[in-house]
Amino acid sequence: MVSAMRSGVEIAPDRVVVRFAGALDRRAVVHVRRILRAYLVRPGRVIVDVSEMGLEWPPGLDVFPAVLTAAGGWPVACLVLSGPTTRMREELDARGVPPMVPVVAEGESAERRLLMRPTRVYRQAHLPADLAAPRAAREFLRQTCAAWAHETCLPAAEVVVTELVTNVVEHAGTACRLGLALDRSGCEVSVRDFRPGPAPRPRPRPAEARRGRGLHLVASLADEWDTVRHTDGKTVWVRLAGCAGEGADREE
């Protein structure tokens, strides 16, 4: 069945304004995703006018941070929502959307907000199941920190990224998804594999041991860390609180 969601587009050299009208339901999410994917690639800066968008399926609001992440995340892609109804704004807040995708009231300057770094920035990379993955992970980390103009966390994060990705290659033997996030509370590294199994934990090792100490290093650097198990794998996440994103909400 065809979605009843309608869209209009206004194209400027430095941004695109997309206006959606109609109910956001399961079918409409497909339409919204397709339109936003196209314009987040070029020019990469999109204002979404949702003032005429109804809300029938609240989980559909997750399409906004999801499509931003798929497009490369800030600053490769920039996305702002404008003019939500009171109910939609409440649902956006409840689903944790605004830290990644700024939301402005109708009449506020969405153009100016488009130029500012969101409170929480996030990027991810998919890495193959081979010995080159840790090196590729470090390179992605360096590129991301440079793009965010935030390299405070690099020394510790490089160790964490290397150890977690190496652990996936050597023990899970699957491809993995590396996620990097930065907000006012710190930097977060997450690595997801695709092999079900027990959560990895540091095991006692002799002081002279040359291998098997990776998770001990991770635990010593982390302010918090844990494992989330999925039906098809697990995610290890690590928070480094000593390198918070002090420049959040700054203009580019």
Name each model-derived stretch.
Residues 2-37, 52, 125-134:
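STAS-typified acidic loop motif
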Residues 28, 135, 139-162:
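Conserved short strand/loop->alpha-helix "switch" segment adjacent to the catalytic nucleotide/phosphoryl-transfer site
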Residues 29-101, 188:
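Amphipathic alpha-helical interaction surfaces in cytosolic regulatory modules
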Residues 90, 94-95, 100-102, 118-121, ...:
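Conserved beta-strand-loop-beta-strand hairpin that lines the nucleotide-binding pocket
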Residues 101-112:
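A glycine-rich helix N-cap at a beta->alpha junction
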Residues 113-139:
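Surface-exposed beta-loop interaction hotspot
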